[in-house]
């Protein structure tokens, strides 16, 4: 769909492809201000074991896809390599073009997600091709104490994944 904007209009392009200039070829570079949001977890499990950003994003997606699409953990884990390939092709090449980066990770996020994703991971069948990955994720989650949803503010970004947002 085509839109005509006045000279004082503001256009917000939200979503994973928002930094791709193919979406806004008619807007001069000098009129663009790009914001990139990503879950850049600042925690380590110990002095030698960092937390992979990809793991946090996988758990976010698992919680959200289960809540919004009824997808189980096996489906999320099976589709994750395709998701990652899409990111490598359509998102990461453009992230350096951002004027500012917003870290959307929260220190309590993994505690909050655990309540929602642990039961899903425990349901992955032993015969599944992603069973090993489910076990790895469960082992990773064992470092975190579950946090009840009642302690999570309704305006927290975590609510996008677990539900109950005041913005829904």
In which residue ranges do the predicted regions lie?
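Short beta->alpha connector loops
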Residues: 16-19
């Amino acid at each position: 769909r085509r839109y005509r904007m006045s000279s004082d209009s503001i256009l917000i392009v939200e979503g994973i492809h928002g930094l791709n200039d193919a979406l806004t070829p008619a807007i001069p570079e000098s009129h663009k201000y790009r914001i990139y949001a990503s879950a850049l977890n600042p925690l380590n499990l110990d002095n030698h074991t960092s937390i992979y950003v990809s793991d946090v994003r996988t758990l976010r997606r698992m919680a959200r896809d289960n809540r919004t699409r009824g997808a189980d953990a096996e489906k999320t884990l099976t589709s994750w390599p395709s998701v990652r390939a899409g990111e490598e092709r359509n998102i990461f090449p453009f992230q350096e073009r951002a004027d500012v980066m917003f870290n959307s990770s929260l220190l309590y996020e993994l505690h909050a997600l655990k309540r929602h994703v642990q039961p899903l991971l425990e349901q992955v069948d032993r015969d599944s091709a992603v069973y090993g990955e489910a076990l790895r994720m469960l082992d990773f989650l064992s470092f975190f104490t579950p946090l009840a949803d009642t302690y999570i503010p309704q305006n927290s970004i975590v609510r996008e994944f677990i539900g109950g947002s005041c913005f829904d």
